[in-house]
Regions:
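Short hydrophobic beta-strand that contains or immediately precedes a catalytic carboxylate
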Residues: 77, 125-129
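Conserved C-terminal guanine-recognition region of P-loop GTPase G domains, centered on the G4
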Residues: 146-153, 157-272
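Conserved GTPase G-domain signal focused on the G5
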Residues: 84-85, 284-315
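Short, conserved catalytic or adaptor-binding loops enriched in Gly and charged residues
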Residues: 116-118, 267-278
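Short, flexible boundary segments at extreme N-termini or domain junctions of P-loop NTPases and their
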Residues: 2-75, 284
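Glycine-rich phosphate-binding P-loop
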Residues: 73-97
Length: 315
């Protein structure tokens, strides 16, 4: 039993015990019989309820319905495994943040963020994070509990995450930044090209069409290509590992690496737009590990959401 289930089980038992005390103190002749019924029937029911999947599915359904009814800015993240999606989320929300719900394929996070510090206006944000390597995990397994039911999607911002170096594990743990930099400093251009090719295989026009058909509605207001791990790129450039590229031209070099993906996303995005519905597209370079540029990509969508006077909870 999880900690949450144990807590609820204990609360149910306490409530039952309070009922026993109240019945016993009432002085009613039927009191002993009612207490016996509680002991024989209610406690086993509580035990079964606290450990049965059906019971918890019912609770989860109530919670999910409430989640969809609650106004929020909703983000949908798409990218290869190891590209930094979860790190990006935790960089913005805080490293200790935990998902509201997590499965083998999917997790989502919720938080409250300030729209502006002067008025103290805040809004709720919901961020979906899909695990693993298969694109189907992002599309076929898309949770209507978070992004809304088909035909009534609630997604406001879509992030396509790419990076210049994969996640590499050694002895069952991912390399830290220093170790990854050491690995990338040898045959740098070849390794970067290989990683870009992996993203090109993952973010293809056919998949993009499915992604947009999965998340699209008039609630979608922004699409962003997020180029992650720019800090690593700056460091290998400073080390002279990429001939002809200087620190002043790092951003341009990174944009050129993913120019084809940028074009594919723009084209897919244009196919779902209409004269009365414009989706803003941008390309942003970030470092999820040190936070560079991370707040901007989320805050731009939140500001656009607010400026368009969409329904938002103001506190």
């Amino acid at each position: 039993m999880t900690g949450r289930r144990i807590l609820i089980f204990v609360l149910l038992v306490v409530l039952a015990m309070v009922a026993v005390v109240l019945i016993h103190g009432s002085g009613s002749p039927a009191g002993p019989m009612l207490i016996s019924i509680l002991l024989v029937a209610v406690f086993p029911i509580i035990s079964v309820a606290a450990t049965t999947r059906v019971w918890w599915d019912l609770i989860d359904n109530f919670r999910d319905d409430a989640n969809l009814r609650h106004p929020a800015v909703r983000f949908y993240l798409y990218g290869r495994g190891g590209s930094g999606k979860t790190t990006l989320i935790k960089s913005w929300l805080g490293g200790e943040v935990r998902p509201e719900q997590a499965t083998k394929y999917f997790a989502y996070y919720t938080a409250e963020k300030y729209l502006d510090l002067e008025t103290k206006r805040r809004c709720r944000v919901v961020i979906s994070d899909y695990q693993g390597q298969s694109p189907s995990q992002n599309t076929l397994n898309a949770s209507s509990k978070v992004i809304g039911p088909p035909g009534q999607r609630l997604v406001n911002g879509v992030f396509f995450i790419v990076d210049i170096a994969p996640r590499i594990e050694k002895n069952g743990r991912p390399l830290d930044t220093y170790e990854l930099l050491e690995w990338l400093s040898v045959d740098t251009e070849m390794k970067i090209r290989k990683r870009v090719e992996q993203h090109l295989e993952y973010i293809v026009p056919a998949i993009l069409e499915i992604v947009f058909s999965t998340v699209y509605s008039h609630n979608l207001i922004s699409t962003t290509l997020v180029i992650n791990k720019i800090d690593l790129l700056e460091k290998v450039v400073a080390m002279g590992c990429i001939p002809g590229v200087s620190l002043a031209s790092v951003d341009e070099y990174a944009r050129n690496l993913f120019r084809r993906i940028e074009y594919n996303i723009r084209e897919a995005c244009d196919k779902v737009t209409s004269p009365d519905h414009n989706i803003e597209f941008s390309v942003v370079l970030v470092s999820a590990s040190n936070g560079t540029g991370v707040s901007r990509i989320f805050n731009d969508t939140i500001k656009r959401y607010s400026d368009m006077n969409l329904k938002i909870e103001v506190k």
